[in-house]
């Protein structure tokens, strides 16, 4: 679900203080975008939203969430309706819970 090697790599690249800011910004922006996913939007907007979410997720190691976003992005690109937008939200919530729980342990070590 989470690529911890990517998380560690990013934290080492930017430092602990900046990493905390990046995590806070990521969670806020992604949560907001996920909450506004709507199957009634034009496919081009859904594709754009899922592309943004995928890229953001990959930067912070949310691989399962990113993979689901990628699946939806491809469907939207090819004119297919992606009916799993609820799964995208669920995947984000599950990933977020795991990430925050494990991150506390990782930082404490």
Language-model features and meaning:
Residues 1-48, 52-109:
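Two-component system phosphorelay core
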């Amino acid at each position: 679900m989470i690529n911890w090697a990517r998380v560690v790599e990013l934290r080492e690249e930017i430092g602990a203080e900046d990493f905390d800011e990046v995590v806070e910004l990521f969670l806020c922006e992604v949560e907001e975008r996920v909450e506004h996913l709507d199957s009634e939007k034009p496919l081009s907007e859904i594709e754009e939203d899922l592309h943004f979410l995928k890229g953001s997720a990959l930067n912070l190691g949310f691989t399962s969430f990113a993979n689901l976003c990628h699946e939806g992005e491809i469907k939207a690109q090819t004119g297919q309706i992606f009916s799993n937008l609820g799964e995208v939200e669920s995947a984000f919530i599950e990933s977020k819970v795991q990430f925050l729980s494990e991150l506390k342990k990782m930082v404490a070590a």
